């Protein structure tokens, strides 16, 4: 896990923001990745190791959902998006609690992450496989998607390359 400029690992930042939003966070970790599991547990996550992570993000997501089958909904968040504000995550959780089935944040009109899916999508989430994750579920139900416009550029900022590690511009700080 690569650190951000402040020295804290990317995934630890993402986990910290989820926990700070008041969520029961389940983190799915590749079987045997004990260093990552330890970091996430220290941040307050409930860690579950998944032996079949080679089956793709969808299978990992299904494994995580299976850990909380009775939940009223799930917020699908990624470890490579550490700059999403906990207040944004809490807004998504609030809409799920109020009965919304599909919720996502938007920044300047552009849909971001994480995406919240209500209980009605539980069976579909539990059946996922491959690398598409929940993308197909969201696409098939686009007309039901509630976009919450928020002043949080972090919802669009994932860290895929070394250049992405630099702090955002002053007017885009998350």
Question: Which stretches of residues belong to each language-model region?
Answer:
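Short glycine- and hydrophobic/aromatic-rich loop-to-beta-strand nucleating segment
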Residues: 113-117, 157-160
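Conserved alpha/beta core of the MobA/IspD/sugar-nucleotide pyrophosphorylase nucleotidyltransferase superfamily
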Residues: 123-174
């Amino acid at each position: 896990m690569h650190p951000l400029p402040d020295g804290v690992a990317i995934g630890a930042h993402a986990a910290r923001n989820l926990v700070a939003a008041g969520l029961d966070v389940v983190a799915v970790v590749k079987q045997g990745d004990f260093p990552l599991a330890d970091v996430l547990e220290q941040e307050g996550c409930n860690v579950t190791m998944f032996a079949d992570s080679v089956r793709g993000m969808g299978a990992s997501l299904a494994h995580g959902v299976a850990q909380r089958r009775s939940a009223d909904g799930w917020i699908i968040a990624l470890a490579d998006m550490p700059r999403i504000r906990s207040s944004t995550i809490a807004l998504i959780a609030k809409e799920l609690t109020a009965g919304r089935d599909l919720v996502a944040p938007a920044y300047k009109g552009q849909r971001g992450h994480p995406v919240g899916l209500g209980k009605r999508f539980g069976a579909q989430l539990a059946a996922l496989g491959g690398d598409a994750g929940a993308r197909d579920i969201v696409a098939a139900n686009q007309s039901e998607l509630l976009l919450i416009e928020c002043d949080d550029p972090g919802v669009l900022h994932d860290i895929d390359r070394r250049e992405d590690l630099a702090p955002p511009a002053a007017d885009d700080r998350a």
